Each structure stands twice: as C-alpha cells, then as structure tokens.
Amino acid sequence: MVLKRKIYDKLLEWKENSQGKKAIMVEGARRIGKSTIVEEFAKKEYESYIIIDFAKKDKNVEEFFNLYLNRLDDLFMMLGTYFGVKLIPRKSAIIFDEVQSFPQARAAIKYLVADGRYDYIETGYLISIKENIQDIVIPSEERSINMYPLDFEEFAWALGEEQLIDYIKNCFEKREALERGMHNKAMHLFKQYILVGGMPKPVSLFVESGKDFTGVDAEKRDILKLYRNDIMKIKAQYRSKVLAIYDQIPGLLSQHEKRVVFKTIQEGSYAEQYSETFFWLSDSMISNECFLCSDPNVGLSMYEDRGYVKCYMGDTGLLLSHAFDENELLESEIYRQILNDKLSLNEGMLYENVIAQMLVANGHKLYFYTHYSEEKHRNDIEIDFIISNNSKLKYKMFPIEVKSGKRYTTNSLTRFKGKYKARIGEAYIIHPRNLLIKEDILCIPPYMTICL
C-alpha cells in the first residue's frame, strides 16, 4: 500500500515554487520510503518520468553520463530510449534514486537544471560523508529536505483515524482535555505506534493484516540487519566506535540520565574521539542526537556542548526490536501483552525515544539541560528536551519533561522555570494522562506532541 506522507506536500511546494530552477534532494534513512513517495509524486504530477536507481550500478546508464554530459540532447535521447519513456519539456521529471551511489550524477545537477527542460528529484542516504562527496562539487541548484519515519499523525492516517487527529489538534488549541473514551482510544493508538514504529513496511503489514503484529517484528529485524551491514562497510578506523554506540543505544536509554558516558565504552575515551561516529549516525539518520545546552536561550545552538550527548533511535519500533536479542523473534502475543500493560518493560526508554522522534519529525533540533547542585551533590534540574522554534512565540524557548508514569513531581521543571523565567514561552510535561494545567505547566498526553 502507498501511505499518505506529509512530505508529498513539500514536494508539491517545491515543484510550484522552483519551476525547474532547482532540483530537490530527499534525504532519509534506508527503508524510510523515499523511492516510493518520489515515484508516486512523479506518477501523479507529471505526464512522464524516468527513475534511475543508481544502487543497481547499471554500467550502461553510468556510461551515458560519462559520455554525453556535454551533449544533453544526446543524453536525454539515450535515457528516454533506454528506459522506454518519452520525455516532454517542462512536463517530465527525472528521478536520481540512491544518488550517493553515483556522485557524478549529483554533480551533473548544476548543468541539468541550467538546461531547464525537466525537473529533477534526487533521493539519498549518507550523502554527506566524505566517501560520497570527495570528488564532486555539491550543486547550489539543489534544495534538500529530510524524510523521517511516519510520525504519529501519519500512522493514524494509515489506520483511517483522520478525525481523531483533527479532534486532538482542536483540543490542544483550546487547551481542553479529550473526552475520556477518546483519550483512551488515542492512547491505545499511540501505544500501537510505539510498538510498530513508523517504518513504512512494518506499518503497511500492520494495517493490511488488520492490526496483527505477526510479521511486523520480522520486518523490523530485517531493517536492523540492513543497518548493521551498512555499519560494517564503514572505514575500519571508526567502524568499531559506530557499532559500539549503535549496540548500546537501548542500554543507554534504559539508564536514568540516558546520556552517553564515553569512558564506559572504552576506558580512557572521550567525546572528541567520537565526532566522526556521531556524524555518521546522524547522516545515516539511524539515530537522533540530543546535545546539552549549557545556557538555555533562544539561540540554543550557540550554547551546544557536544561533550554531552543522548543518542536516540531514529524509529521507536526499531528500538523495541533492537532492545531484545537480535536472534529472538518477538511473537505477536508478546506485543499484545506489552500493548495491554501485562508485560513489564522500560516504558521510560520508549516514551522518551518516541517523543524525540516526533520532535525531530516536526523540524526541531534536540537539546537537553542539566544543572548540578554543589550543595546537594547531584543534579537538581534535568530537562529532557528544549525546543525554540515555535511559530507563535518564536523568540522563546519551551522546556519539555517526559513522564512515562501517571505519578510524578514537577520539581525539576519548576526550578528551571524559576531560573530562566524571562526566556520561557511555555513549559510542557508529556505524560500518559489527559491534558491538564498544573502549576502553570501544560501537561499533555504523548499523542499531542504532534502539536509542538
């Protein structure tokens, strides 16, 4: 099934605004659905299109670019003939799928866009690492957009719950709690989202099977194996570090502080030694990094301390499968026990990861904050996330605490508010209960994160 994705509207906006003057690059992790959505877009929005999958390493196609880039009439004739597609000026699109596999095609975008006859859509993965850009000039005629796993809203669409999403958004705008039955329904749907995740194939299997978890876990494990295989192809000098961080993500997130303690990975190691590691993980979009903001203000990035980092899995459904033994396939019944709260597991790990995933999908860069009290000899403030680019109050920051249980204190967030009162637009606690306002803090259920 072809899933409805928000990125489709971004592609439409690009097509209407660029009028052939810029190509668009869709970046995203493997198996995120890049190829599917761009081909669906080309099919609906153009009279004809060619999709070139450079991962197939077709020597004939590569030779066309090597021989005819200076003779574009010949290049287009060869491509049209080879793929059996009639290209129509200003009414056809050419898709460069997995363009990182043939960087010369990406470099050619400069000349192809200048020619102006066709629109160009690229998809890429790991497009910024040195191996994929060292011999080319990255074209300025290229606009880049990120594609993520399905967010909760897209997951709800896939299950036919558009009206529920509209109701959730309406309640958030009015600062009203959902009707109890609707809240329970939304929480049940959200738990399904945590377990299945947002990777298109597992979601499609879940929907098509009538919400059966059979096959979902196996599909997720196939994706995890693909990620591990990609890591094993990295240059030897930092392969082991990437693998160490990747393997430790579930363990790190199950701890109280959740941040990476580098000396526990290898004795005597420190953050600077892992800069390439996190660059690879970030560029692959396998994980979402959250850095310490040492002095929370509107310009959060100005006070970013990369020596302190939390590393979340890019997809929470994958995190769940990754947290169990790789060779131990989770039966559908296990998923149902988790869904119905009959099997105990670290919900805090999953909740914080899924909130990170949803914030990133909304365009936020992730930051956290801690304050160590010399008097108490411990952290007396711990803020899980801070965001700043809210459209209504864009010059303020918004601290977020994530609570997986229904009973909790607000001490940490209250202290943070007292310390940085003038800089804060609104403070949020994300909890499993319905919407309520507590001590001037807006407490919202996790599904309302789509509104932040």
What is each PLM-predicted segment?
Residues 43-61:
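Conserved catalytic segments around the Walker B and adjacent sensor/switch elements
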